[in-house]
A protein has these predicted regions:
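Extracytoplasmic/secreted proteins, especially bacterial periplasmic and envelope-associated proteins
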Residues: 31, 35-42, 60, 64, ...
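Short linear motifs at secondary-structure transitions and domain/linker junctions
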Residues: 50-54, 64-69
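Active-site signature of cysteine proteases
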Residues: 62-64, 70-71, 76-139
């Protein structure tokens, strides 16, 4: 529903427009969490799609992200103090759960990190620390 119009001429142009709307580096500290949801609403409005974007604090050890993904909704995951990404925002697209014999399970979230061409990387879903996320619902 409307997803074919999300691309702004090219992937590069779309990325650059989000970079502007999120005011990345405008405050000399990267992108502030508070600017991400507004950027989604502004971008979608520019391409003629009405949406409601919302910033959520804490992922409840990743379970809230898994719940969104299970309902077929991509999530903008905001990571802090990650061993590889440090403080970086990525698009969460799916997840895998590994079950252990008698020890529960671990969840890994599939992401598009903007550093590689394909969304084929995973981060541990327990989201160590205070990771936040943004959801976007089309109206």
């Amino acid at each position: 529903r409307g997803y074919d119009t999300l691309l702004n001429d090219s992937k590069y142009d779309t990325h650059e427009r989000f970079y502007e709307l999120m005011e990345t580096n405008e405050h000399c500290e990267g992108t502030r969490d508070e600017d991400i949801a507004d950027a989604y609403e502004s971008y979608f409005d520019e391409i003629g799609i009405n949406c409601n974007a919302r910033l959520h604090y804490s992922t409840s050890e990743g379970q809230r992200v898994v719940d969104e993904l299970s309902n077929n909704r991509a999530v903008n995951l905001i990571m802090y103090n990650h061993r590889r990404y440090k403080d970086h925002s990525v698009l969460a697209l799916g997840y895998i759960q590994f079950k252990y014999n008698g020890y529960g399970y671990s969840t890994y979230i599939r992401i598009a990190d903007g550093w590689t061409k394909d969304p084929d990387r995973y981060v541990w879903g327990s989201c160590v620390g205070t990771w936040n996320y943004v959801t976007v619902e089309l109206n």
